[in-house]
Amino acid sequence: LMDFGADGGEARTPNIDALAGRGALFTQYRASPLCSPSRAMLLTGMDAHLTGFATIPEVLPQEQKGKPGYTMALERGVLTLADRLRAAGYRTIMSGKWHLGEAPGEMPQAHGFDRSFALAASGADNWDDQSYMPYYKDAPWFEDGAEASVPEDFYSSRFIVDTAIRYLDATDGDKPFFAYIPFQAVHIPV
């Protein structure tokens, strides 16, 4: 993969370049080779260790469990972009992969989202309501913090986008909105 044109890459990306020219470019973002730490950093603007997600729960060594940076829940007092935008009057929704905790107080509603349809696991099948790894028996989907299921004609990307649109259509269109849409299909099985 290469950078967008606005960031010096050789790919022609005129629409993205135009957006970049009218917006803000963030140049200090850090990614992790693991999904939860990357999402925690993206949502908070903080280093993964400070968020509580230095790794993912599925590979957390026993000796690190519960230690600072390895709580596998967003640390107390850590604010997400959704927290900040909701406080500024935005309607906030998320639809897609969460994997930042599924206990009470760890779901998206506890972190600034008005509405959410969230996959709490590291991943799930893109076509069926089932796990794609032996860590989980079922795919743990939640709507607004309550256990949920997906429809029979489920395809993850279509469902995630359709759910986000449904949430936006059901809210006050006069308010600005923040829609966080972390797709599941970037994970296996592709």
Predicted regions span which residues?
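Formylglycine-dependent sulfatase
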Residues: 1-190
